[in-house]
């Protein structure tokens, strides 16, 4: 391990000072110079305080000028209409902000009302569609009536078809001819049963 030569702190301090001098001579901007953080924060705080003082002074000057203008306007016998631009200049910043927020609130309420009206109109359209689907229109022509759907389509009546007819799909069953059911209480026999000796089948 090679040992680094011991450097005196005085020499290091002198080197830093010489660097700052060189940077200043070259006319670098102030942000390029190495400044500790605390100094930078203190500088920002000073600038902030100066700005606040300037604003307070402007406000005081405005308050002082305002009563003088009121007195001069009251002494004048003829009433003059003040233009809108001068009135707006007299309004302090807080009042301007207040008016701006009021205007934003009005716009927002207007926008919300328009949205509510649009939602209400959409709901009415949906209700009208539902009602028209529940009560289909009466159509004289049967071909036109085919296009209107009924809410409950009639189910297949099982007593009309033979046993297990419901098992087959409707498309197949429409081509098959069905014989109607016979009453089981009646005897199945030919008309000549009196003449022949055939026993009727149950």
From Swiss-Prot:
Q: Name one GO biological process term.
A: response to progesterone
Modification Phosphoserine, positions:
18, 72-74, 76-78
The reply on keyword Secreted is: yes
What does UniProt note about where in the body, tissue by tissue, this protein is expressed?
Mammary gland specific. Secreted in milk.
Feature: compositional bias, Basic and acidic residues: 16-25, 51-63
Q: Which domain of life is it from?
A: Eukaryota
Q: What does this protein do?
A: Important role in the capacity of milk to transport calcium phosphate.
Q: What else is known?
A: The sequence of variant A is shown.
Q: What is this protein called?
A: Alpha-S1-casein
